[in-house]
Amino acid sequence: MIKHKLRKFGPVTERRDYSQTNRTWETFDFLETQKKSFKWFIDEGINQALNDIYPIHSNNGKVIIEYVNNSAKLEYKTDNEYKILAEARQKGTTYSGILKAKLTKTIVETGEIETAEVLYGDVPIMTSGGTFLINGSEKIIVSQLIRSPGAYFGLKVRNKQADDLFNKLEIIPKLGSWIEISHRVTGNTTDTVKVKIDKHKAVSLVTFLRAMGMKKETIQNLFGSHSTLEGENPILKETLNKEKFKTEDDALEYLYSVIWRGNNRITAESKSNLLSNILFNPRRYNLSKTGRYMLNRKLSLVDRIIGTYLAEDLFSAKGTKNAKLVFAKGTLITREIAEKIQDSFKNNIFNLIPIPDVSSDIYAAQLETNPKLAERIRVISLNIYPNKTWMEQNTNPIIVIANDPNSTELHLLASDLVAIVSYYFNLVDRVGQDDDPDSLINKRIVGVGELLENQFKIGLSKLEKNAKERMSAKEIEKITPKNITNSKPVYNQFKTFFNSSKLSQFMDQVNPLAEISNKRRVTSLGPGGLNRETAQFEVRDVHSTHYGRICPIETPEGPNIGLILNFATYAKVNDFGFIQSPYFKVNDGIIDYEKPIFLTAAEEIDKKFAQSTVSVDKDGKITTQNITVRQNHDYLIVSPSEVDYIDISSKQMTSIAAAAIPFLENNDANRALMGSNMQRQAIPLLEAEAPLVATGIEADIAKFSVSNLIVKEEGEVSYVDGTKIKVKSKNDKSKTYYLKNFEHSNQGTLLSQKPIVKLGDKVEIGDLLTDASSFKDGEMALGKNVMIAFSTWNGYNYEDAIVISERLVKDDVFTSVHIEDQTIQFRTSKAGSDKLTREIPNVSNFSKRNLDEEGIVKVGSEVVAGDILVGRVSPKGEENPSPEEKLLAAIFQKKPSTDKDTSLKVKHGHAGTVLDVQVLSRASGDVLEDSVEKIVKVSIAQKRKIKVGDKMAGRHGNKGVISIVAPVEDMPHLEDGTVIDIILNPQGVPSRMNIGQVLELHLGMAAKTLSTKFVSPGFDGLKFGTIQEILKEAKLPENGKFTLIDPMTGEKFDNKVSVGIMYMLKLSHMVDDKMHARSIGPYSLITQQPLGGKSQNGGQRFGEMETWALEAHGASNILQEILTYKSDNIEGRKGLYNSLATGNKIPAPGTPESFNVLSYELRGLSIKLESQAHFKNAQIVKEVMDNE
């Protein structure tokens, strides 16, 4: 027997583990990213947003409203969350808290101060499951993956012409103007460098720098010594030569006219404040903390000077008696030396250089209030040679200018701009690196907390405008913080965001995996993101920096492919929004298992990473001598001592859904993608069953799924039943956990919980108390283990169709329960009020058979389409009675009924058992919309057995539709009489290259024979030879093939067939939801054609192609009837009916309505369309008149 470990998964399940990974790190809370982000919003984001908007000054400057820092508090209930959420779901309300903050009013003249607490309205609160309950429905906010604020350099193609290349630099803030610096690098002539602010006209770089206050000589000195081998920088020289402005003031005036074109009122003050307001004003320009971090990292020396040679001696404390040589001229700069040089400048060991001519003009407006600004404009300057050849030829050195590494300001500084321009010219001399826009080094996650903060700021800015208007309209003495603060803008902003934003989604709750995946989804779309119509292939493609951060497999198949992604299993997001991946540190070939180290993509540069499957001894020493490691974009073979880090798990690369696919490494990536997506569509079955062949992540999903109840305080189980579990803690306090029973998800699937603990069990924090839908014994269980054969069967499994045994129907193997709500409102209007009643006019007793005395359906009733669920009559209004109604009223001496039947009926194509009825009424104290007096909600449960037309799939992207349910006696069987449950087409395997399903088949058969279970993680699963050995152990054929017998003939199949156990899923694409038929139904008002789709009770129209078919057969009369009488010629049809009834001649058909639509459209274009018959008649009249 091959050596293996027995590992425990969940409370009771043991599985054989043959994986090579020596030790893995336990998975953490899968919802940590969402929860952490929302906690930041409550703790810091709200306070930060209020500080950004306040103080608010009145228009006359006499009153200031200020926010008292850290006084904001969000009040909401956290105790007994289960009951609060259950009530909110029932009543269709939002789970929210009230936001309060303290504001002070200061009268400038007197200095009088008044403080008051004001309300900012309701803010939706995140539940413990990472969701928001909005109007009774669970929603989630999807995290956004967008380009980080910062500076980006690189070659760009303009006008989609490969020969039209531009060197381009973009400075992207979180708030404020975008700056673009560029010049053409193709063509025979030297192009000048241009600067573009937002979408304004481009100006010369020299003009821009001179407008900042730099003289031509300063520009030449700072950037002109960027030499090429020819000895001079031709691009800067050309730009300087073409500079047309004589003075800095002229340059500033021109820049002002470009930015404020059309504004002729140029004053000295407005000119001097121009750049200050656009780039250096914290209220108008904000890089954000992330942007400042990115800018400092980009403009630092480290990544720019690696591999170059020092062109000067570096001394510590230069210019003093204690000066000491640290690095000599000619030193090759490695990463280690580059980091030491950068740190030395940062810690003031090497001196920073002040920039002349800049600060006085740029900061003229701010110097009075903050004189220290001028002192901060310092930069790092270093002379280097790009390579050894340049150094040996003793050419002019290149000056590399970096910004002040101690900068923390969130707006741009002059030192930043100087360093950026330096970097730009350095790139011409091949010093520095172009940025990869698709790398995760340059992309960050905008979490739910930051998205809510942005919405809060938008709401506050509207509130600020409103407050200023109110202050202008009131006397100073009557202004108070309360009466000028209107909470509606903030409340409405949150409401709009949660109800209509692309990032706010109705939670996918088909099964627990779908729920967790939906919460861990990342999108590149949405505000500030990409557009699916214009996103290129490069943006959608897998990138090397995705490893351990973004799953390369799980993504949609349609137009969103590569734009909607999922976090990898162990990925985290740091405070700056960059995704981190965990690794164990390797020191001289020995793995440090103490604690994983989380690294961003930028921190991985130049490091070597080994895979988790390398051989390791009991002391953590790597025993494999030649190891394949990952470094940057390449794979190398190195010795153990050269390895820097090692993966913590083989699941590290993939998302949770992809990690749930066994033998993932044996499947083609396209099929693995389908397998990941289809697992999220698996319907919870009546009786869950865990897979015989799992990956190990199933137990982790159970542990962190909000569907299951988890122990919060250790103790002993003191009470268990189907509705609640009580746990008695050590201090004799009892905590009650309430179970869900027959609740339904957003998608109508069953949510139910079963206890898995017994009376007297000792439980600890984190232990599972229940199995929810799609869980079994503390493991995720989406499908069933069934006997599969790969064979053809009378052509019924052609083109991926599936043949199933009737046993699966009779034994309810794939039976599921679906619950749907139908709601009706009772309103009050001018015409009268809707009434709840059993006395409904013109309705048979059969349709009312299930109603109680009030007119509401009884719980437990079996209902079918058309049955009345809630009886409602509504006033007709001021309608005139028809002659028939008048006659009946005269005969029976009754007044004609003023009510019409508007009852709630079971939808077309639906049926089931009434599970629950809820009544909400204003009289009972429920909060309802205006004019709504009562709401009745009826829940109908439907038990669906598997049938022809339902879609099934395995976990390897092997999907198909059931084509026949064959009787058990007709299904092939093994020699021992075991009947096959499902027959799949063997031709579906080779071309799809998802061999994992075949390996699962054989291992599943062995698992059943040995009465054991296996775990086979992706990229660390069982190898083919190991499976053969296990089949031997189970005394099964090594090739996994068996003799099948055809029961119809009693003969054996000619060839042996692969037979085994595979885990199959029933997907949420059921024929009951799709099949539809109608006899009569609604028609489009304009074209008089039938509506389309099941949701609108639509039908089939005789369309263009059907018309061609009749034309081809020459069936002119049938064609004429179909296009006129039988279609949309309403008047013609009435005439036809009268003719047939009276026996008269059938009138000629009129013009079809759809033809009239065409003629009306042409009339709109001033074209009059007349038929040929009209012209003929006109011609005859003309001839008669001529003859006369």
Curated annotation (Swiss-Prot):
One of its GO terms (cellular component) is DNA-directed RNA polymerase complex. GO terms for molecular function: DNA binding; DNA-directed RNA polymerase activity; ribonucleoside binding. It is an enzyme of class 2 (transferase). PROSITE patterns: RNA_POL_BETA. It catalyses: RNA(n) + a ribonucleoside 5'-triphosphate = RNA(n+1) + diphosphate. Its EC number is 2.7.7.6. Keywords: DNA-directed RNA polymerase, Nucleotidyltransferase, Transcription, Transferase. SUPFAM superfamilies: beta and beta-prime subunits of DNA dependent RNA-polymerase. It holds the Pfam family RNA_pol_Rpb2_2. This is DNA-directed RNA polymerase subunit beta.
